[in-house]
Amino acid sequence: MGSSVTVSITNEIDLERIARILASALPSHAMIALEGDLGAGKTTFTKFLGAAIGIPSNEIVSPTFGLIHIHQGPTQFTHIDAFRLSGVEDLEQLGWDEIISQCGWVIVEWPSRIALALPDDRLTVSIEVTGETSRRITLFSESSRFDGAIDALLIATHGG
């Protein structure tokens, strides 16, 4: 069945708050599929998520041309931009099996490009542009491992 929560935000301060809440409640090993149109705030959200665990936000940039960036912090933080990937074959060349078997967080922007390779055990974060600075953020997972993160955001934004 899965669980989900949707939150409307009006600015980047709200986005940062959501990232901090999520960071405090994610399991130590997590796959995050980050969906949204170009300019929706996927990389900004990723910067805030990394900053919440002590990775300087200036170190987190879009890996569009490098495809993958690995950051060491209290939790290994692997950031992948799948926009330029053609599919699973390209992932194998990046060492996908090793990446997803390591402890830490794996954040994938443009997950639809590699949908067949994504594990079912993941959290999907969808960022929808609703205005110049406003967004609708939806967290969804079929896995009960992410119930704590979804519940934490639900409690923080809707009061339970």
Stretches found by the model and what they are:
Residues 22-29:
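Phosphate-binding P-loop
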Residues 55-71:
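Short beta-strand-centered segment that lines the nucleotide-binding/catalytic pocket of NTP-utilizing
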Residues 32-34:
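Hydrophobic anchor at the beta1->P-loop junction of P-loop NTPases
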Residues 2-21:
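N-terminal pre-Walker A segment at the start of P-loop NTPase domains
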